[in-house]
Amino acid sequence: MTIELSDRQKQILGATINHYIATAEPVASKAIATEYNLNVSPATVRNTMLLLEKSGLLYQPHTSAGRVPSDSGYRVYVDELIQPIPDIARKAESLLSERFIWRQQRLEVILRQAAQLLSDLSGYITLITLPNALERQIRVIQLVALDSQQVMVILVLDTYETQSALIQLEQGEEDPELRERTLQVLTNFLNHQLQGRSLVELSAIDWQKLDLEFQTYSQQLQALLRQLRDRYSHQGTAFVISGLADLLQQPEFSQVEQVQMLLHLLEDQQDQLAPLITTDSQAPSQVQIRIGSENTLAPMQCCTLVYSCYCYGDSPVGSIGILGPTRMPYARIIPLVATAADYLTEQVSCRR
């Protein structure tokens, strides 16, 4: 339901939410009238706050208390009232550039460092999903002989992450030179067939193009590649999470039971969390925000999740988000997530 507000109502709603974000205390009309230069009387502020309460944008936690924003109030605030703070974006980009030597590190290490930095800057929990190996394009395949019958299959993905598995050859080759030639032929064949494809495209391999003398290996290779594909198809989304201890510093999480439920979700039920941080396919690069009850999981309904995706080229490969109380400084957090997502996209895409 769209709520039409006058300019004055927007001013007072914005001031009330800003005050509550800063203090974590219910906001009295007197505080708005005296601390914000709105050029209105205390009576006008009081009456306007009452109207905002009747509209469902504010509420009183106790009869004698001031007012606090509802989830609907925060939604209006985020969609219509805030102005993102550009300085935090510049600071984040500068720190990301200074702190990390991207190409010299594995992607998971980079993501962990980025998550830690965002938690430090925001004071909240940072969530980053790792790229799904099943959907990533294969850059290079290498077959390496360990002995006459064991071969290590190494996949290098387009993000430069590596995956590996062992294959036991039924008919090993004792001659080292012949074994090396055989593996080189098989390696060249697989690279020609699979470079630029993903593991979900194994059916595209034309095994008839493999030289006849090496056809004896085709069934074993097919079985191994199917095994790799099945392994990753059953893997849940892997998360990098940082800042869990920061949760305890927020007054909203003073109840032990509430914290335990949220920690259980973050640590043990990540398969349920993954759909919430997946961006809208219609606007994958935009920052998206789930406020309070907009989160479908009960432990997160006292939280806001601000998230976006990072890409390899134009293709989303993972998500990055900041999770905190609904009383978060949105004007700082939104540009922080946007900057981090853009920077991860830049670094992942240039790992060629």
Curated annotation (Swiss-Prot):
UniProt-listed GO biological process terms: negative regulation of DNA-templated transcription
SUPFAM superfamilies: GAF domain-like, Winged helix' DNA-binding domain
GO molecular function (one): DNA binding
InterPro entries for this protein: GAF-like_dom_sf, HrcA, HrcA_C, WH-like_DNA-bd_sf, WH_DNA-bd_sf, WHTH_HrcA_DNA-bd, WHTH_transcript_rep_HrcA_IDD
A Pfam family: HrcA
Gene3D superfamilies: 3.30.450.40, Heat-inducible transcription repressor hrca homolog, domain 3, Winged helix-like DNA-binding domain superfamily/Winged helix DNA-binding domain
Keyword terms of this UniProt record: Repressor, Stress response, Transcription, Transcription regulation
Highest taxon of source: Bacteria
Family from the record: Belongs to the HrcA family.
Role summary: Negative regulator of class I heat shock genes (grpE-dnaK-dnaJ and groELS operons). Prevents heat-shock induction of these operons.
Protein name as it appears in the record: Heat-inducible transcription repressor HrcA
Organism per entry: Thermosynechococcus vestitus (strain NIES-2133 / IAM M-273 / BP-1)
